[in-house]
Amino acid sequence: MKLYIGQEIEDKEDVYIDASSARSILACGKRGTGKSYTLGNVVEEIHTETDDIVPLVIDPMGIYWTMAEENDDQRDLLWDWGVTEQGFPVNLLVPGDPADRYGDDIVREFRSRGIDLNPLLLNPSDMTPDGWCELFDLNINKPMGITLYRAIRELNEDDTPFYLPDIINKVEMDGSSSDRTKEALLNRLEMARDWDIFADEYQDVWKTFDENRINVLDVSVLDPGQYGLRNLVVDVLGKELFRQRQDARRREEMGLRVEIPKVWLFIDEAHNFVPSGSSSLAKDMLIRWVKEGRQPGLSIVVASQQPSAIDSEVLSQCDITLCHKITTKEDIRSLDKLSQDYMGSNLKTYVRQIDNVGEAVFVDDDEETVQMVKIRPRKSQHGGGEA
């Protein structure tokens, strides 16, 4: 399976990504050079060229719903490339109630444009005791952390799904904690109820996705931050997808029927989720996805205008790099560490050859190739332009 991404700048030969197996891809470039555009390009190809893969876009800017619209703005350019403008079916996932997040007018407009709009809610029982403590920034060796950890651990022992009211009840019934500790912890749990991201009944993640659409998770409606709700949603969702694909892979190896497809996870502004030099709620999960995801059929594409701000463990595991224009010393230095002997020169030497928006250095470690590429125009509307 090959994904058409553009042409070599000099000889105009078509350039493809070999997607016959799981891949880990870095798309980077300073603002306005095309990294989000390129990410959308790969999403289009995955949707068009595969029938056993679910594309899931983590969208921190609220711009990828525009993939449902045709790229009328570049119709002439598309014609020159022999490509036809096209809108794609989009399943827009919203943490919480879409009407509360967007307003009724926006919801109606989305649906009038053919966009399928669905809430995504988290199962509280999918989070570990440590995860709950991290969410509230609680030390598990101090009273509130001890109380919450104990409550989640005891609920897990029943081996059945549990919800926020169950956690609240467990804390209220804790005879080992002081009233002051319980009151402070209950205030935090009531605050979590107001976030409107936790389910009141069990949610099967896969029933939220649509295998026939591009799945876009709009986390722009949530507060940012390394320990904010965006990271929480990505962490819980990613862990569940990883677990289910591991189970599916075991069945595949035994020749048994599998209902859980492979996943390509696309993350824009990835430095907010796997930051260099600091932690986040989603960081450990995403590093595991990059390191161990190939075997269960999990691919990832991380995009950032600040590659130096992405954890080095993620960068070093990427087997494809699509680098647009980069100028800051920190970013160039970070990318240059990815240089390999087969390149014949340091990566920064190739980056300096980029002259125009939409051009990129394409490095494929599996093929041991380096190419200067002009990224093909998008078939669908790009939502990343400035107002």
Kindly give the residue locations of the regions a language model identified.
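Pre-Walker A (Motif I) flank of P-loop NTPase domains
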Residues: 20-25, 211-215
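P-loop NTPase motor domains
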Residues: 41-57, 61-288, 295, 352-368
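Conserved ATP-driven motor cores of ASCE-family P-loop NTPases powering translocation/secretion/packaging/pilus
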Residues: 44, 289-370
